[in-house]
UniProtKB/Swiss-Prot annotation:
Organism ancestry: Bacteria, Bacillati, Actinomycetota, Actinomycetes, Micrococcales
Catalysed reactions, as listed in the record: L-glutamyl-tRNA(Gln) + L-glutamine + ATP + H2O = L-glutaminyl-tRNA(Gln) + L-glutamate + ADP + phosphate + H(+)
Name the record gives this protein: Glutamyl-tRNA(Gln) amidotransferase subunit A
Keywords from the UniProt entry: ATP-binding, Ligase, Nucleotide-binding, Protein biosynthesis
Role played: Allows the formation of correctly charged Gln-tRNA(Gln) through the transamidation of misacylated Glu-tRNA(Gln) in organisms which lack glutaminyl-tRNA synthetase. The reaction takes place in the presence of glutamine and ATP through an activated gamma-phospho-Glu-tRNA(Gln).
Record GO cellular component, one term: glutamyl-tRNA(Gln) amidotransferase complex
Gene symbol of the encoding locus: gatA
Disulfide bond residue pairs: none
Length: 520
């Protein structure tokens, strides 16, 4: 079953449909893989093996009975542990929710269940999705399958590592400032942030409600497109969910067709804009070399490469780190030790609600979460709201206008996804600003609500680790992004002789023991 787990989700779906393999066989193969390698990676926080095999058996029975099934029926999936799943733990990577069992499903989980995709389990993340390395999880860091001494990105490092290590063919993540795309870049996977509102946020534990977006993690562009079609669409339970009053579209239809069209590698007439401000100083040389090589591939495929300038992008990081913590400080107020989750009682003194809340939050939240709550509360405080939060929202408007101007010159925009390849554990923990700079290229898309995709862009010369390339499209033009992404993927694989993950080191070998021990 070793080769089975390395197939794309689309290829697995085809084998399932033809009867060549069963869903139980596929699901068991991934569970066996998790048992073999996750002790090294720590990608999963909770396994859902019994239910996954039950759903797989139901799919096999339905298929044998000739029932009509979704294309991805029987294809397993992993879920970031920020998305609630009924009857299963949802921790958000935090001690404050340790042991909490969700009484309901997120909308995306309802859709996954309706498609009859077996849920393998819940994946690790930075606490409440606050981080760029998955080092801030209360349950230990996830390790990068390419080098166990390095980070897998964040906040969704668990989902990216699981897909990269062949523990799952697909996963769900959330992206507030790059938490799907940046892990994709450093693990050699595909990560997509859909148009804001294109996928329901109902049931995703909110960090920053105006920025958060659920999206797919996969090994191919087509797989991501197929998954986004499953989870996308209007949801009346999410007040920010998009719906077009004319045609009812949200930007989550026709994606797989667009990816299949792009796979022929022809981009004749497509204008691709290189964002001047997303490169240069601070970007690793090997990342930029691979980026320039990809531009030449795109030019050779008929695309017109133009340079565009978005001056306000230079302020995006600052605006984000005022807006995001402000919204997070409000969203996390519900974790008070009274309603649900951890309750820590004060050791002495009067037993008031305020003192229970203080003791609970002090014990339940990690340092990065506390840092952002304090920053957000300060930015929203009387006398400072206009100077900080209000000013950041004005810069957000400028960023949106720069996107509009750029898309008047180009059909899609392109940049490196992250400035560097994966860094060593502990390398940036003492310097929050250095950590935050990992998201400098991904944050603008969240501030503007436009879709973004990261796909593998080869291995950097300095360290032989994956780098990523990012595509950005106008809002609701997700299909165009998938078309260009699939074309670039086809061009890359023709150059590389196959998917980049084929070059990843083997896991589960005794030779990795030293590397694992070094990260503990």
């Amino acid at each position: 079953m070793t080769e089975l787990i390395k197939l794309s989700a689309a290829a697995l779906a085809a084998k399932l449909a033809s009867g060549e393999v069963t869903s139980v066989q596929v699901t068991q193969a991934y569970l066996d893989r998790i048992a073999l390698v996750d002790g090294e990676l720590n990608a999963f926080l909770h396994l859902n093996a019994e239910e996954a095999l039950r759903v797989a058996a139901e799919v096999d029975a339905d298929r044998a009975a000739g029932k009509e099934l979704h294309e991805l029926a029987g294809v397993p999936i992993a879920i970031k542990d920020l998305i609630v799943t009924k009857g299963q733990p949802t921790t958000a990577g935090s001690k404050i929710l340790e042991g909490w069992i969700s009484p309901y499903d997120a909308t995306v989980i309802e859709k996954i269940r309706a498609a009859k995709m077996p849920i393998l389990g819940k994946t690790n993340l930075d606490e409440f999705a606050m981080g760029s390395s998955t080092e801030h999880s209360a349950f230990g860091p996830t390790r990068n399958p390419w080098d166990l001494t390095r980070i897998p990105g964040g906040s969704g490092g668990g989902s990216a590592a699981a897909v990269a290590a062949f523990e799952a063919p697909l996963a769900l993540g959330t992206d507030t400032g790059g938490s799907i795309r940046q892990p994709g870049a450093v693990t050699g996977t595909v990560g997509v942030k859909p148009t804001y509102g294109g996928v329901s946020r109902y049931g995703a534990i909110a960090m920053a409600s105006s920025l958060d977006q659920i999206g797919p993690v996969s090994r191919t562009v087509l797989d991501a497109a197929l998954l986004q079609e499953v989870i996308g669409g209007h949801d009346p339970k999410d007040s920010t969910s998009l719906v077009d009053p004319i045609n009812g579209q949200t930007g989550c239809t026709g994606l797989a067709d667009a990816a299949r069209l792009g796979a022929n590698g022809d981009l004749t007439g497509v204008r691709i804009g290189v964002v001047k401000e997303l490169g240069g100083e601070g970007y690793q040389e090997g990342v930029e070399v691979r980026f320039r090589e990809s531009l030449e591939l795109l030019r050779g495929a008929g695309a017109e490469i133009v340079e565009v300038s978005c001056p306000s992008f230079g302020y995006a990081l600052g605006a984000y780190y005022l807006i995001m913590p402000s919204e997070a400080s409000s969203n996390l107020a519900k974790f008070d030790g009274v309603r649900f989750g951890l309750r820590k009682l004060p050791e002495d003194g009067p037993m008031t609600i305020e003192r229970v809340m203080s003791a609970t939050r002090a014990a339940g939240f990690g340092n990065e979460v506390k840092r952002r709550i304090i920053l957000g509360a300060y930015a929203l405080s009387a006398g400072y709201y206009d100077a900080y939060y209000g000013s950041a929202q004005k810069f957000r408007t400028l960023i949106q206008r720069d996107f509009e101007a750029a898309f008047a010159q180009a059909d899609v925009l392109i940049s490196p996804t992250a400035p560097t390849t994966a860094f060593k554990f502990g390398e940036k923990m003492a310097d929050p600003l250095a950590m935050y700079l990992n998201d400098v290229a991904t944050i603008p898309a969240n501030l503007a609500g436009v879709p973004g995709m990261s796909l593998p862009n080869g291995l950097a010369d300095e360290d032989g680790l994956p780098s990523g390339i990012q595509l950005l499209a106008p809002a609701r033009e997700d299909a165009l992004m998938y078309r260009v992404g699939a074309a670039l993927e086809a061009l890359h694989e023709a150059q590389w002789g196959g998917p980049i993950l084929d070059r990843a080191p083997e896991l589960g070998a005794a030779s990795n023991a030293t590397a694992v021990e070094g990260t503990k």
